[in-house]
Protein backbone atom coordinates (compact mmCIF):
# COMPACT_ATOMS: atom_id res chain seq x y z
CA UNK A 1 0.00 0.00 0.00
CA UNK A 2 1.44 3.39 -0.96
CA UNK A 3 1.88 6.19 1.54
CA UNK A 4 -0.45 9.20 1.31
CA UNK A 5 1.19 12.27 -0.17
CA UNK A 6 2.13 15.15 2.13
CA UNK A 7 -0.58 17.75 2.48
CA UNK A 8 -0.01 21.44 3.04
CA UNK A 9 -0.71 22.60 6.61
CA UNK A 10 -1.00 26.30 7.40
CA UNK A 11 -1.55 28.32 10.58
CA UNK A 12 -3.54 31.52 10.19
CA UNK A 13 -6.10 33.91 11.67
CA UNK A 14 -9.85 33.62 11.04
CA UNK A 15 -11.08 36.83 9.37
CA UNK A 16 -14.64 35.70 8.54
CA UNK A 17 -17.04 33.08 9.90
CA UNK A 18 -20.29 34.38 8.37
CA UNK A 19 -20.77 31.42 6.03
CA UNK A 20 -22.29 28.17 7.28
CA UNK A 21 -19.57 25.54 7.91
CA UNK A 22 -16.97 27.75 6.20
CA UNK A 23 -14.29 30.09 7.54
CA UNK A 24 -11.91 32.45 5.77
CA UNK A 25 -8.34 32.18 7.08
CA UNK A 26 -5.61 34.78 6.50
CA UNK A 27 -2.18 33.12 6.26
CA UNK A 28 0.89 35.37 6.42
CA UNK A 29 4.27 34.21 5.12
CA UNK A 30 7.65 35.87 4.67
CA UNK A 31 9.76 35.67 1.53
CA UNK A 32 13.18 37.08 0.86
CA UNK A 33 13.32 39.77 -1.84
CA UNK A 34 15.37 38.34 -4.74
CA UNK A 35 17.54 41.43 -5.26
CA UNK A 36 17.66 43.28 -1.93
CA UNK A 37 17.44 40.35 0.48
CA UNK A 38 14.90 42.01 2.78
CA UNK A 39 12.13 39.84 4.22
CA UNK A 40 8.80 40.85 2.72
CA UNK A 41 5.46 39.85 4.27
CA UNK A 42 2.92 38.20 1.96
CA UNK A 43 -0.62 37.30 2.95
CA UNK A 44 -3.20 35.06 1.31
CA UNK A 45 -6.77 34.15 2.23
CA UNK A 46 -8.03 30.56 2.12
CA UNK A 47 -11.55 29.26 2.61
CA UNK A 48 -11.67 26.24 4.90
CA UNK A 49 -14.37 23.75 5.89
CA UNK A 50 -15.45 24.03 9.55
CA UNK A 51 -17.88 21.14 10.06
CA UNK A 52 -19.10 22.11 13.55
CA UNK A 53 -18.78 25.93 13.29
CA UNK A 54 -16.32 26.05 16.21
CA UNK A 55 -13.90 28.71 14.88
CA UNK A 56 -14.76 32.37 15.46
CA UNK A 57 -13.31 35.63 14.09
CA UNK A 58 -9.86 36.33 15.54
CA UNK A 59 -9.03 32.71 16.41
CA UNK A 60 -5.66 31.26 15.39
CA UNK A 61 -6.36 28.00 13.53
CA UNK A 62 -4.53 25.20 11.75
CA UNK A 63 -5.88 24.19 8.32
CA UNK A 64 -4.94 21.25 6.09
CA UNK A 65 -5.22 20.75 2.34
CA UNK A 66 -7.94 18.33 1.24
CA UNK A 67 -9.93 17.37 -1.84
CA UNK A 68 -12.00 20.15 -3.45
CA UNK A 69 -15.12 20.65 -1.33
CA UNK A 70 -16.61 23.46 -3.45
CA UNK A 71 -15.59 25.92 -6.15
CA UNK A 72 -13.27 27.76 -3.72
CA UNK A 73 -12.80 25.45 -0.69
CA UNK A 74 -9.65 23.29 -0.74
CA UNK A 75 -8.80 23.21 3.00
CA UNK A 76 -10.37 21.89 6.19
CA UNK A 77 -10.03 22.96 9.81
CA UNK A 78 -7.69 20.74 11.84
CA UNK A 79 -7.74 22.52 15.20
CA UNK A 80 -8.21 25.86 16.91
CA UNK A 81 -4.72 26.68 18.20
CA UNK A 82 -5.68 29.80 20.17
CA UNK A 83 -9.06 31.38 20.95
CA UNK A 84 -9.56 35.10 20.29
CA UNK A 85 -9.39 37.42 23.30
CA UNK A 86 -12.59 39.45 23.65
CA UNK A 87 -12.01 42.83 25.27
Curated annotation (Swiss-Prot):
Gene3D superfamilies: Nucleic acid-binding proteins
Cross-referenced InterPro entries: NA-bd_OB-fold, Ribosomal_uS17, Ribosomal_uS17_bact/chlr, Ribosomal_uS17_CS
Family of the protein in this entry: Belongs to the universal ribosomal protein uS17 family.
PANTHER family linked to this entry: 40S RIBOSOMAL PROTEIN S11 FAMILY MEMBER (PTHR10744), SMALL RIBOSOMAL SUBUNIT PROTEIN US17M (PTHR10744:SF1)
Protein name: Small ribosomal subunit protein uS17
Keywords noted in UniProt: Ribonucleoprotein, Ribosomal protein, RNA-binding, rRNA-binding
Annotated HAMAP family: Ribosomal_uS17_B (MF_01345_B)
GO MF annotation terms: rRNA binding; structural constituent of ribosome
Keyword check for rRNA-binding: yes
Superkingdom as given in the UniProt entry: Bacteria
Keyword Ribonucleoprotein: yes
A Pfam family reported for this protein in Swiss-Prot or TrEMBL: Ribosomal_S17
Gene name of this polypeptide: rpsQ
Entries under CDD domains matching the protein: Ribosomal_uS17
Any one Gene Ontology BP term: translation
GO cellular component, as recorded: cytosolic small ribosomal subunit
Function: One of the primary rRNA binding proteins, it binds specifically to the 5'-end of 16S ribosomal RNA.
Subunit structure, interactors included: Part of the 30S ribosomal subunit.
Amino acid sequence: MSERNQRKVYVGRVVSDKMDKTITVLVETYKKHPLYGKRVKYSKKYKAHDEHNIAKVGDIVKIMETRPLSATKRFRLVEVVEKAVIL
